[in-house]
Amino acid sequence: MGFTGFPDEAFVFYEGLEADNSKTYFTRHKHFYDDAVRAPMIALTDALAGEFGEAQLFRPYRDVRFSKDKSPYKTHQGAFVDLTPGIGLYVQLDASGLYTAGGVYTQASDQVARYRAAVDEDISGKPLEKIVDELRAAGYTIDGDRLKTRPRGIPEDHPRLDLLRHRSLYAGRRFDPEPWIHTPEVLTRVRETWHAYAPLLTWLTTHVRSSDHPHR
């Protein structure tokens, strides 16, 4: 069955899970998760796979081993298209609506070093600055893990100091749960944003590349 949109029950399910993040709630409402969240997300990513690649759906369970927050379930459903290990495209559904992103969410130490070296050099740093400026101008957010201070060895007046602070970098756009979210128009919205991330992804895969080192 093709993608037809996300039903109201998906948002009701996550609103309830935010209020009661417990095994009892999840077990009692698991049919809503299966039918209104997981199945439509699979249909959505399957419809986009021919153009962007196969997506991995994340499990609904949180890893709480090293977290102070022991809530057992994620309050969103995400899916990721891995273009180069760690660099790719993302789509997420939660009680607040739909979110898409593209970039690198975590980087190993060698990737951070390559990223900063490329940003530092005008020949590669200026194109990234232009990509980021154009994404912001088009209404996308630019996010990622950032240092509060400047990296060691970088002068205070570096023209790309803000980008150099990043340890990860991705662009994103959030959509409120408007009526179109219940229709196949979701495909168009996700496709448009994923195409918009292409220049950033190309820059990252060219200059950062994948890593065999442990991620931070």
Tell where the protein language model's regions lie, with residue ranges.
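Active-site acidic/histidine clusters and adjacent loop/turn architecture
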Residues: 10-11, 15-60
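Short histidine-centered catalytic/ligand-binding loop motif
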Residues: 28-33, 104-105, 115-119, 182-186
